[in-house]
Amino acid sequence: MINVLAVASEVYPFVKTGGLADVVGALPAALAAHDVAMRVMMPGYPAVKAALGAAPAVHHYAELFGGPATILAGRAAGLDLLVVDAPHLFDRPGNPYLGPDGKEWPDNWRRFAALSLAAADVGRGAVPSFVPEVVHAHDWQAALAAAYLRFTYGERARSVVTIHNLAFQGSFPVTIFAGLGLPPEALAIEGIEYYGGIGFLKGGLHYADAITTVSPTYAEEICTPGSGMGLDGL
């Protein structure tokens, strides 16, 4: 049996804006038949915390990208969950990425860097009751976990980044780099730098131990200049 932590910004049936949520929600049951014990990490949106109910905190942060936070462990809808409870980042109206005005939250970089860092911390043994051998990050919102893990000195989980939709890459101004907590050498073409800015997905793909996508056909397509969205060379 291998322990795997799946990390995603949305998971069915709690929060869904697209197919990503369906895939991540179905993976644990599908992989259990292959001797994989999977827990799912996701942000502590109001709907997630309501479904989880009273759940113990298994890790505490005095400060996580702007405020205190905890990792909650529990079970809901047949899924074993680790939830990043950071109200300053995730207790908001709207969908996971947009406010009620339909615009992206200006601190989305901070919100999903926090999710990624929490996943990496679990991959470094922060939750003794569940130490994964693999951290499986889905799309740009979780991809930076691979970068945080790569800059770990000591025991760590291996990282897998899965691309569901290459059109969404998590691109931000270079000015956010200092707030990510990564070492200076990460700000490079052979790192998370992307056309003068920061690319969460690009950085995750660069630092991941393995990369997968949703089908063999899509894997071939995104390796071509026409469909690679600027990342085909990577």
Task: Label each residue range with its predicted role.
Residues 1-234:
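Catalytic cores of nucleotide-sugar-dependent glycosyltransferases that transfer UDP/GDP/TDP-activated
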